[in-house]
Amino acid sequence: MSTHARPLAVWLAQAPDAQLAALFEARGVRADVAWSDFFDAAEALLEPASIERALPRLPLTEAVALRRSVNGDDAGDDAGPLIALALLRPDGTPAPPVAEAVTARQDPTASETPPPEPSDESAAARAAERAFTTVAALADLVLLASDTPLALLTGGALASGEKRRIAATGTAPETLDDLAAIAVDAGLLAALDRRLVATESADSWLRESASARWTGLVQAFRAALPRGLRDGDGWLPTTAWAAQYPWSTAWPEQCSAIAERARLLGLIADDGSEPEWAVPLREGAPADPASLQRMLPTEVDRIFLQNDLTAIAPGPLQPALDVRLRRIAVRESAAQASSYRFTADSVAQALTSGETAASILDFLAEISLTGIPQPLEYLVTQTDQRHGLVRVFTDASGRTRVASVDATLLDAMGVDQALRPLALARDADGLTSRAGRDTVYWTLTDARYPAMIVGDDGRPLVVDRNPAPGHAPPAAPDYLPLIARLRERQGPDADAAWLDRELEAAVRSKAVLLVEIEMPDGTARELQLEASGLGGGRLRGRDRAADVERTLPVRSIRSARVIDPSAGSGATATGER
């Protein structure tokens, strides 16, 4: 048993709950760890494996400070964080297990890094174009996730099938994982049950201007940076990022990914220089997109509607208009001038999401430079007339019922093999199913039946197939039960508790102890005892000098030291009352 754990255990017992929770989280402690008391916690935190896991997480300044402390120098201002991580004692010195682990690693070196060179006009223009492309690609990604959650692999990357589907929109496949990471940091997407889903905040972000979208993304990107890259409210020069976690073998790959996201957001130019709009962010100020906005194409608020059921936007369509138009039509091409196509399915989808024929036609009339062509008006009105021919609702008995004035439709649904999982049964009033109302509705919709959910009052209901979760930061482990358990086992006398642990360890290892006993007359006597048992408040063992078995009251033991056989009466560990 390590004697170095004893002072750490005392410090842990005196620390507030919040400080303990922060320490356990930073050191990667499981909330359900089977520690019995603070001595267990201290020993676990000083185990070589635990220390080896903690060191790679130290940013450069703390790694340098810890190395200074190991070398016998003052850790300086970074002593506080290292003490909070239980890598330094409260006096600023490292415990021997920490010193041993640090000594085995290379010396970290810190150096001043000047700010990056400002971008010239050409490099800034390319960075602005990339930022614009990234914002548009993220909007596509969020819209796709709103319609159908995106499948994730076990490691958190997008599944290959999803990448192929997204790449069909024109987004470069190699950027998709970085785009998803940017969206997650911004709270637009969230990973749930190995699926990437759009959050509640995604809808409002989609309706913002391109510069406002970019502002939200880059400020979230900054907030999510690892603490080793932060400089106050801003970040360190990007040229210094690679050196910030000197003891982490995974950092080069992580740093490369973070730098690529910064490049995608237009915060780093291709030549490594810094565009004008990145400077306030690096310095910790709010984002100022004015200089970026000057390099972005002007957004338009009108489109050309054509007789072939297509729409042409002569420039980047304002995001709010683009989002609504894409709920009604399929976007066929995405560029500074985009094209959209209206189909019966796309209009039906809009009606399903809550639009009406009147709202669709009013919207198109408002943004069209060419009026509404007759073929498009006919498509909308005909689709609207057909929509809702099939009504889905829950009857008084709790079963799902499918009704329609068109008996032919009911007959078709009754024999449709695609609907077999619903087990539809025909009766005089239509079809019934044991499946839930929403399940029946979406299955019919996927099979392209003009279905509509109606409530108890017979009015249409709009149901979101993939309700967006609220954006919340990942829940931190709950260490309160663990801390409460450790405090319950915390006795009033830390010295006595430590002695008990030393004696238990000696019995388990059948060690030879040099025991100091307090005699009834107040004097002290030392015995060499081969520990054999502990119980009932008594220590049992063979007295080496007298070669007899002795039973000693634990309350009379002042101290116990494990004797190193190779050193005669040398001591290797100490427990004192």
Regions found by a protein language model. Name each.
Residues 9-14, 90-94, 194-198, 335-342, ...:
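Short, exposed beta-strand "edge-strand" segments with a Pro/Gly-rich flavor and a Y/T-containing core
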Residues 1-247:
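Short, amphipathic alpha-helical interface elements at domain boundaries
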